[in-house]
């Protein structure tokens, strides 16, 4: 009797499998991915080696994987090669990709980039921290923010730890410069967050925490980048 029961069960399973095999294939719905503004992609000013299709694919893949932000680096000599004459071509393309993929934008318009300042456009020469540079900085960043509606944060100083490690005497000058630029931009764009960036690995490896403390109360935020392998120089 027991043998017949098992045979019957086996036949029922076989029939069920056969019926399932005859049913049309129903595609499994793709899982919904929620974009996270804290997860971003980094895009430097495009070189000629990068095609528009490659950029489109990179942005699309990033957004479908959950990225909700683009950290966009713009260099002053590229965006304003002539005074008051802006080169929007590349930036318009990148910003359209951000809009199409629902990405917020953090603008890296760094007056300081690690151990160097600038690069500035040739027409500016090499200005020091002061009123003239403050006015030009506010004017150019204002033009960029006003052109696009998706920039919600701006970084003015990048890897300050590296710069001040070489130019310790410039800390006070830059702090005054940053505060004046911050105040002017906040009057024009009160919802924009403005801050500075430090290299976490450099701060920890070289005991430069005091520079972070100098800027902890300035601006809206302090952000850290991290490269786990220390560079030789």
Which residues fall in each region the model found?
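Hydrophobic alpha-helical membrane-insertion segments, chiefly the h-region
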Residues: 14-23
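Boundary/entry segment of secreted carbohydrate-active catalytic domains
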Residues: 24-68, 73
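Extracellular/periplasmic catalytic domains that process cell-envelope and extracellular macromolecules
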Residues: 33-35, 63-64, 100, 146-149, ...
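Aromatic-lined substrate-binding rim segments of carbohydrate-active enzymes
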Residues: 56-64, 71-119, 170-195
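Hydrophobic faces of well-ordered beta-strands that scaffold small-molecule active sites
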Residues: 37-43, 70-72, 105-109, 154-156, ...
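N-terminal Sec-pathway targeting helices
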Residues: 1-14
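Short strand-loop junctions, especially beta-strand C-caps/beta-turns
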Residues: 44-46, 75-79, 159, 227-229
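Active-site cleft segment of glycoside hydrolase catalytic domains centered on the general acid/base Glu
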Residues: 53, 88-90, 117-219, 225-233
